[in-house]
């Protein structure tokens, strides 16, 4: 009997518990919103408004497109809220596909996420960060790549500390990013009196094909809210909390995008907006001079940082889910309970990202190569 009890106690002490080695509810609702908003609001909002304005050719339809983008995203978010509350899992889309179509199909999706989609997105955003930081501090002929490598390593190290550190950094970066967009909106309303002319609303109607093209740009800018599924098992409050988190994120995104576009119309006019290649920079420069343009560069760099960190958080969880289900990738299926993070998933992700950045060094345009790689 003594031998049996000793063996049982030894087995208990040496076998990791399910709590220690699986995701637990450590994320606050605010942190979860910061992750979702941080993924969605990237550099796109600084570029796509001019493209949408040029395609629609009307201020009214421009705003309709952005509002409709919010409604479509909301509809999708409601579907994901149902999935995330019914099947909360670190695998997110991978887990949903596995339940619907089997693990073979879901493996292809998760493998693409792990090796191309997430890692390629991180690499291209790292080059965006590097390009903007090089304007402030040039580190030589490979400055952009050096900055890109540095940011991948730095954010990976922060995430290795644990979910508390990474979520705190994510919240801070998202606040700075949103503040920057609010500053852009203020600049637009500040110079609205100097705008060429008040844009006419619904004076012309774009063709169905052109409006559809505008919606492509809009939905591209809204893209990423579905990543909420990857953190659904880690939000405090469980199933009751994830629905408000997703809905609040979409509401915040829609309000910010509408506010920014209204401000751009007020400050630049429809024609100025449609012809601008850097709408936010032009607006900030017009409102505050060279100082405004330099400040915007900092906010764009922060936007890239925000998206990189958020993508790292959800991407590592894809690696973890793969490791849990596939014996050949078992080394990635370890969850560090004390840190609340898939440490090995982060390390694999970082290695692939760094390899992509280093590959980009030897290309004419590292950013362009990463765009083609992820397309």
Segments the model singles out, each with a brief description of its role:
Residues 5-50, 54-60, 73-74, 78-81, ...:
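Membrane-interface "cap" regions at the ends of multi-pass membrane proteins
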Residues 18-23, 63, 137-143, 171-298:
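Helix-loop-helix junctions that connect adjacent transmembrane segments
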Residues 31-39, 118-120, 340-349:
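Select subsegments of transmembrane alpha-helices in polytopic membrane proteins
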Residues 33, 62-67, 107-108, 125, ...:
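Hydrophobic alpha-helical transmembrane segments
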Residues 57-59, 86-90, 99-105, 233-241, ...:
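Juxtamembrane helix-boundary/capping and inter-helix hinge elements in multi-pass membrane proteins
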Residues 65-68, 136-163, 178-185, 346-355:
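Transmembrane alpha-helical segments of multi-pass small-molecule transport proteins
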